[in-house]
A protein has these predicted regions:
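Membrane-interfacial alpha-helical segments at the cytosolic side of multi-pass membrane proteins
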Residues: 74-79, 143-163, 189-199
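Membrane-interface loops
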Residues: 41-52, 82-159, 167, 204-213
Length: 213
């Protein structure tokens, strides 16, 4: 198998290796934080509130798209990153910071889920319960993470359009299933923009590497 010489140079670089390892460690810590924040928020969930969108639309069964839609997105991103490994450290760390900040938000206010909502059945894969818990509402990761990728790839028009459209689509999906309040979806765009800029500030070297052709 022929390996692109430029890719090989990155793989042999100690700086790159450290950046990748740091990114994976940070992402693992973020996922642990997400797990405990989600369980905490769900256990302490209070009353539900009215919502101008959810109160006026029926519940749709969007479980398949809700579960497997993000998997398709992550597989596409993974394939892309294999071809451009220098972009991986900044992407990893930005996603990790997103998850950590969202975990903090989830832990703060414990509004209960909307009473008339889609319930994941017993036929749902067990692993989904490691990432979503029912009370981890604010703000929507289904909306925020694709938009984060849109911001990261803003200079690449096709990816910018793809990930922005994905963020909007997933936002509509979680509202159709009454899985998030409308404020969870709308706020995700604004909070994610701030997270993206925090990532650029925190990981300047990784961002510089990301920008390389």
């Amino acid at each position: 198998m022929n390996i692109n010489p430029k890719h090989l140079a990155y793989l042999k670089s100690k700086t790159y290796t450290i950046a990748i390892v740091d990114g994976f460690i940070l992402l693992c810590l973020a996922l642990v934080a997400n797990f405990y924040a989600g369980r905490f928020a769900t256990f302490h969930a209070g009353n539900s509130v009215q919502d101008i969108v959810l109160s006026n639309i029926p519940v749709f069964d969007v479980s398949t798209i809700f579960i497997y839609g993000p998997i398709v997105m992550w597989v596409m991103l993974l394939i892309y990153c294999f071809n451009k490994p220098h972009k991986i450290p900044f992407i990893l760390k930005s996603i990790a910071i997103f998850i950590i900040i969202r975990s903090a938000f989830v832990s703060l206010t414990h509004i209960g889920p909307f009473p008339d909502r889609l319930i994941m059945g017993s036929d749902s894969p067990d692993w989904i319960r490691l990432f979503t818990f029912g009370g981890d509402l604010f703000f929507s990761a289904h909306t925020g993470l694709p938009f984060l990728l849109a911001l990261i790839f803003w200079k690449e028009k096709a990816l910018r359009i793809l990930f922005t459209a994905t963020a909007i689509f997933f936002g509509i999906i979680v509202l159709m299933g009454h899985l998030h309040y409308s404020i969870d979806v709308l706020s995700a765009f604004f909070i994610t923009y701030t997270i993206y800029n925090i990532s650029k500030w925190m990981f300047k070297n990784d961002f510089t590497m990301f920008e390389l052709k």
